[in-house]
UniProtKB/Swiss-Prot annotation:
Gene3D superfamilies named among the record's database cross-references: Cytochrome Bc1 Complex, Chain C
Job description of the protein: Component of the ubiquinol-cytochrome c reductase complex (complex III or cytochrome b-c1 complex) that is part of the mitochondrial respiratory chain. The b-c1 complex mediates electron transfer from ubiquinol to cytochrome c. Contributes to the generation of a proton gradient across the mitochondrial membrane that is then used for ATP synthesis.
Keyword list, A-Z: Electron transport, Heme, Iron, Membrane, Metal-binding, Mitochondrion, Mitochondrion inner membrane, Respiratory chain, Transmembrane, Transmembrane helix, Transport, Ubiquinone
Free-text remark on how the cofactor is bound: Binds 2 heme b groups non-covalently.
Gene of this entry: mt-cyb
Descriptive protein name: Cytochrome b
Record keyword Transport present: yes
UniProt keyword annotation of Transport present: yes
C-alpha cells in the first residue's frame, strides 16, 4: 500500500513538488533563489499582515500610524524593519534569479520565463505602491513623479493620471487605493508563483551544463530540501542582521519627513532596486521616449528567448557570451549608480552610454556573439 503522502489528494500534490520531484543532480547554489523568493514572499506577507493591523491609510494619520507601530506596538519596530528591508532582499534574490536564467539559458522554457517576467512586473508595482504608504516626503513625491509618467500616453494621458490619483493631485484617495493594491498584489503574486511552478514542473529544471539531464535525476528531498535550508538560514540571518543593526541603510532620509506638497525634495529618486530603470528613463530627454525606454528595459526580457541564436543553451562553454553577460551586469550596476546621482555632467552622458549598451547587449551584441560561436564550432 502506498504511503499517505503518495495517496492523499492534497499531500500527493505537495509530494510531487517538494519530495519526489526529479531534479538534475548537478544544479548549483544559483538554483536556490527560486525557493528563497518563496521565503521572501512568505516573510513579506506575514510581516505585512501584522503591519496592516496597525496602519491607517489616511493622509492625516498614515505617517503617525507608522511612528506608532515603531514606538508603541510590541516588536513593531522589528516587524517594520523586517518588512522594509525584506523588500530589498526580495529584489536582490529576483535579480540574481533572473541573472541565473540569462546565464544558463533557462529562458528557453518560454512559459515559465514569461510568467516570471509578469511576476517581476507585479513585484515592482507592489513595491512602488508600498513605498507610498508611510506618507513621507519621498513617498509623496515618488508617487507624484512616477504616476505623472502616465501623462505621456497620447490623447488619454491626463485622464489616465487623474483616474489613478482619484482626483487632481496625489491625495487621500490615492493613498487609500495604493494601500488596497499593496494588500492585494502579494496574493496575486502567490497565485502567479503557483502557475510559474506548474510550468516549470512540466519541463523539469535546467542545469549548469544546459544539457538534458533525464538520465541523471535525484529526488528533491533530501538532497535539495537541505541545500535550500542553508540558503534560507543565510538569507534570514543576513536580513535580521540588517533589520537589527542597520535598518535605515537602504532607505532615504527624506522619508523621515512627513509628506508636504509645498516642498520638493532636492533629489527625487526611488528605492535602490529601481534606480537602473530610473536611470534609463532619465537618459532620454523626451518624456514619451523615456517612458517607452523604461518599459522596454523590463519587457526586453520577454524577447530574450526569441533572440537566442546559439546552438548551445547555457553560456558555460561560450567565453565570448560570458564576457558580454558580465558586461551587462556591469551596465546594470553603472545604471543603478547613475540613477541615484543628480542630473548633471558627467552623470548624464554616462547614463546614456550605459543605457545604450544595456539595449545593444540584449538586441545585437549577445545574438551576434552566439552566431560567431556557432561559426567557431563548425571549424572543428
Amino acid at each position: 500500500m502506498a504511503s499517505l503522502r503518495k495517496s492523499h489528494p492534497l499531500l500527493k500534490i505537495a509530494n510531487h513538488i517538494l519530495v519526489d520531484l526529479p531534479a538534475p543532480s548537478n544544479i548549483s547554489a544559483w538554483w536556490n533563489f527560486g525557493s528563497l523568493l518563496g521565503l521572501c514572499l512568505a516573510t513579506q506577507i506575514l510581516t505585512g499582515l501584522f503591519l496592516a493591523m496597525h496602519y491607517t491609510s489616511d493622509i492625516a494619520t498614515a505617517f503617525s500610524s507608522v511612528m506608532h507601530i515603531c514606538r508603541d506596538v510590541n516588536y513593531g519596530w522589528l516587524i517594520r524593519n523586517m518588512h522594509a528591508n525584506g523588500a530589498s532582499f526580495f529584489f536582490i534574490c529576483i535579480y540574481l534569479h533572473i541573472g541565473r536564467g540569462l546565464y544558463y539559458g533557462s529562458y528557453l522554457y518560454k512559459e515559465t520565463w514569461n510568467v516570471g517576467v509578469a511576476l517581476f512586473l507585479l513585484t515592482m508595482m507592489t513595491a512602488f505602491v508600498g513605498y507610498v504608504l508611510p506618507w513621507g516626503q519621498m513617498s509623496f513625491w515618488g508617487a507624484t513623479v512616477i504616476t505623472n509618467l502616465m501623462s505621456a500616453v497620447p490623447y488619454v494621458g491626463n485622464d489616465l493620471v487623474q483616474w489613478i490619483w482619484g482626483g487632481f493631485s496625489v491625495d487621500n484617495a490615492t493613498l487609500t487605493r495604493f494601500f488596497a493594491f499593496h494588500f492585494l498584489f502579494p496574493f496575486v503574486i502567490a497565485a502567479l508563483t503557483a502557475i510559474h511552478l506548474l510550468f516549470l514542473h512540466e519541463t523539469g529544471s535546467n542545469n549548469p551544463a544546459g544539457l538534458n539531464s533525464d538520465a541523471d535525476k535525484v529526488t528533491f528531498h533530501p538532497y535539495f530540501s537541505y541545500k535550500d535550508l542553508l540558503g534560507f538560514a543565510t538569507l534570514m540571518v543576513t536580513l535580521t542582521s540588517l533589520a537589527l543593526f542597520s535598518p535605515n541603510l537602504l532607505g532615504d532620509p527624506d522619508n523621515f519627513t512627513p509628506a508636504n506638497p509645498l516642498v520638493t525634495p532636492p533629489h527625487i529618486k526611488p528605492e535602490w532596486y529601481f534606480l537602473f530603470a530610473y536611470a534609463i528613463l532619465r537618459s532620454i530627454p523626451n518624456k514619451l521616449g523615456g517612458v517607452l525606454a523604461l518599459l522596454s528595459s523590463i519587457l526586453i526580457l520577454t524577447a530574450v528567448p526569441a533572440l537566442h541564436a546559439s546552438k548551445q543553451r547555457s553560456t558555460t562553454f561560450r567565453p565570448i557570451t560570458q564576457l558580454l553577460f558580465w558586461t551587462l551586469v556591469a551596465a546594470v550596476l553603472v545604471l543603478t549608480w547613475i540613477g541615484g546621482m543628480p542630473v548633471e555632467h558627467p552623470f548624464i552622458i554616462i547614463g546614456q552610454i550605459a543605457s545604450l549598451l544595456y539595449f545593444m547587449l540584449f538586441l545585437t551584441l549577445i545574438p551576434a556573439a552566439a552566431l560567431a560561436e556557432n561559426k567557431a564550432l563548425e571549424w572543428n
